[in-house]
Each structure stands twice: as C-alpha cells, then as structure tokens.
Amino acid sequence: CLVGSEMCIRDRSRHMIAVTSETSPLAKSDDYLAAFFMDDYIGGRYSSTSAVGGAVLSLAFGPDVFAQFLKGAAEEDALAKEKDLSKNPAMLDALIGVYERNVLGYSDTAVLPYSQALSRFPAHLQQLDMESNGKSVNRFGEPVNYVTGPVIFGEPGTNGQHSFYQLLHQGTDIVPPQFVGFKNNQMEKDVVIQGSTSQQKLCANVAAQIVAFACGKDDEDNNKKFEGGRPSSIIIGEKLTPAAMGALLSHFENKVMFQGFVWNLNSFDQEGVQLGKVLAKRVLAHEIDGALKVYSDLLNI
C-alpha cells in the first residue's frame, strides 16, 4: 500500500510492526502485525542490539545478518568480562582514554575509521560517549572535582586527512586519534592501480599517519616541522562484516561503561538533553519572558 493512503491506514495491521516497551500504549494495540519489546531503561544509544536495531536491520538485510551482528557483539561482550587486561580490549581502551583525559589533560578524541562504510560511525560514537559520560556530577548527584568525558569527533580517514588532520599534526592542542582499519575490503572485488589495491592504499595511509603523529619530521623551516610525540591508538579487523560491526559497537559501549565506572558516573541517563526540550515547549506555548522571549522574537516564533 502507499504510505498515507486510506487503504494503508485501514490495513496497517498487515503492513506495520511496533517496537516499544511493554508499558507503552502501543504494546496493547492491535493495529500492528507484531510488537517487539525492549526494556524501559535502554537508552537509544545502547539500543542497536535490542529490538530497535533488530527490526530495522532484519528488514533491511535479513535476520541472518542480524544474527551475525549479535554474535559479534556477544563475543566482544564476553571479552569485556575478562579479568586479564591483555585479553580485555574494551577495558584497555577505556584506561588509555582515562589516562589521556585525566593525566595528560587531553580534552578531545578523534575517531578515524578508514572505511567509507563507517562514515557515520564517528557520529554514533559522539552520541554514545558524550551523552553517557558528559557529566559533572557523580552517580550520587555530587559535583566531581576532576574532568570526565572527552569531546568526540571524526570523519572517514582520507576525508579527514584533507581537512582537520592539519590541526592534529601541527596544532597547539594535542588530540589523540583513534584509528579503525581493516586488512581486507568488505567488497569481494577490489581494483588494482599502480601495483596495489584500494584497500592497501587505505592501510598504507593508516600506517603513515600513525608514524607521522608519533615521530614527526624535523625541518629547518618551522612551517614544515612536525614535533611528533602525539599519541594514537588503532583497532584492526580482518574485514568489516556484520559480526565485526557488532563487535565494534560492543567494544565502544563497554569502553564507555568502564570509563563511567572509573569516573563514578551514571552513564545511562541524559538529563542534559531534557532542559532544551522543556524550554522549547515553553517557547511554542508562548510561555516566555526574559532572554527566552528575546531569542523567540529574534527568530520570529
């Protein structure tokens, strides 16, 4: 049926599903083919492996792909329970991040995936990390006297190289990059140009950037001099498969959780999101005064 058509609205129980919590009014409705439930306490940024992600991914790619995605996430979750730090990559990554933030004083982290398929992944991690650990009070509601979550930003590798890498290499602030790279292209066919594949060229750029950040380059011309000494980390996979994607998501979710433990934060609420929503409703209801009225008038609301 055509979305919005009378027939579609009348027969939506044959064409639509609901993903909701069991306490939602949707859970008791007969207007949907099926309802899939998620727990009330699961925030959107942690919902990729819940019914929210399952419904979308299964419809788009099939249930087998979603099953592989879950398998990769589950395997990474199992590693997060390891007591041996050398076998627990999420914990190790979390502690490196805490050291960079609280000991070295770096306020930002750049996430740099060398795969166009992960072009929106830095934006997801931006929400995951900053919404979870961008807090100034601990889980007991007490103000903290130390810095917490960093600013997260990023772009796919070679795009970033021709934009903000300049600041990462020669800027006055040190921003630790976190690279994500894969040995093999997820596409079965790759092109060979001048003796190397496109994937090999991507990997060559990753290796070059890591060494450039660490070692720098001396030059009599200060404008061409690179101080080096800029730390970075890298996550390497064989190929970006559904299982690898699930593992990657799980890795960063556990990393954020571990950092929340260290900083004694509640990484699973987002009170900072609510204030803007409340004020926006006041603006639309014209219940405003002071600065809120000034900006409402300025924007002709």
Language-model regions: role of each:
Residues 121-124, 163-165, 189-198, 223, ...:
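Short conserved micro-motifs at the rims of enzyme active sites and ligand-binding pockets
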Residues 217-229, 233-234:
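Generic long, charged, amphipathic alpha-helical segments
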Residues 195-202, 214-215, 237, 259-261, ...:
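Extended, charge-enriched "interface" segments that sit outside catalytic cores
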